[in-house]
Swiss-Prot record:
It is a multi-pass membrane protein. This is Solute carrier family 49 member A3. The gene is slc49a3. Gene3D superfamilies: MFS general substrate transporter like domains. The lineage of its organism: Eukaryota, Metazoa, Chordata, Craniata, Vertebrata. Keywords: Membrane, Transmembrane, Transmembrane helix, Transport. GO terms for molecular function: transmembrane transporter activity. The chain crosses the membrane at residues 41-61, 81-101, 109-129, 150-170, 181-201, 206-226, 264-284, 296-316, 330-350, 355-375, 390-410, 437-457. It comes from the Eukaryota. GO terms for cellular component: membrane. InterPro entries: FLVCR1-2_SLC49-like (IPR049680), MFS (IPR011701), MFS_dom (IPR020846), MFS_trans_sf (IPR036259). Its main location: membrane.
Amino acid sequence: MAEDVSSGEQTEDQAGQPLLNGEIIASNGDKCQFRTYKRRWFVLGVICLLSCTNAMLWISFAPVADVTASFFKCSLDVVNYLSLVYLIIAIPVGFGASWLIDTLGLKYAIVFSSWLNMIGSIIRCGAIVPYLNPSGSYTGIYYLFTGQSLCAIAQPLVLFVPAKLASVWFPEHQRATANMIASMSNPLGVLLANIISPSVVTKEEYIAHMLGIYTVPAIAACILATAGIRAKSPPTPPSASAFNSASEPFIAGIRQLLTNRAYVILMLCFGAGIGIFTAISSFLEQILCFRGYSNLFAGVCGALFIFFGFIGAFVCGLYVDRTKKFKEVVKTCFALTALTSIAFALVINFREQTVLVACVCSLLGLFGFAISPVGMELAVECSYPVGEGSSTGLAFISGQIQGIIYMILFQKLTRPFATSGPSPCGMNQTEIYDWSTSMLVMAALCSFGSCIFIIFFHTKYKRLLAEVNFNGLKEELNTHET
């Protein structure tokens, strides 16, 4: 009896086909061998670089919002819209991105998004080119919005591909880890932007340096994606679910998702988490400003927020790959995130408590970001056989919609904050606001969403069950042949 399932890495011949030692997959499915390829790590690396650069471009102005507003002679609200435009554009584009990923495949999604990302980053640099901005004009902000809009179109493609990548290229015991690595490269970009922007923009004129710095990795990602990704899937699938990869038609899949009770609960609660964390990432500098914390400290807190998020996501990803306890991990992280959000809403009201604020930001990232990769895998598990692009994409679209609502709501709940002297974070003290009420509402939303998910979310792991049944059928066929 030939061995049917192989998890070892295989080499490839010059024609790009796998070198198999046993039977090749037959059309009737009764003989199949699963293979993994070293090339999957290159594809993962390109997606990570692309996702990281896209996030850097998104959040690049938020850590230096006050300096940006002064340089381009606009209000803080306009600077906030540079981040908000990502969420607004991602909603209509998200449905097209889900269709493209599930219909045309990973290759086209990655290459197309990399070109949008690169062109958008270059257009942003037009804001500081003297020839394009005559003296006395305020056209620079329009170049920023145009570039941000192109990068925003790329974002859904970038955010929706990790689950598809994990399913198509990685075996079942590596899927959650691959999803974690690809997913967390996006907050890595946020982390780097929180460090780079305040470090570079110590003076208004250094805005030009910042724009140039963020363009370089976007160009590199485009070159690697265009030249290096040659196929939308490996020649031989890595798992049973990848072998049986035919998913529901796009419209039928969306309809099936919206009638799946477990998925709808996950979509709304997971989306709420995305929306809240998007708002915190965009406003962190302004949230800490009203108690006298500097831009640099806000950048450090943002970096800690993401760094500990990596740790949480990494640990949870490895744990879930080995135990398959998706529900338990996500519910635990939701509960701990809710408790930490309450602590965050309280500690930001104290002055000169840098250690305490930094610790709470670290814990918020540790528990909050751990939900993302495991939550995406859980979305696929509870909605199988709907395509991965659709199941994760709809959850992210929910997050973008809620992100817009929360960003507008939190800004409306702020109050002008009177200062007795210049703030260490703001050049224009009339535009410093008290965010304490907004953060209390944020904590309430986190707590409510966590309770809903913990109490009402229940599901079977449909993809894992399908793989178990498939492998069991193969073993039965092989036994009869022997």
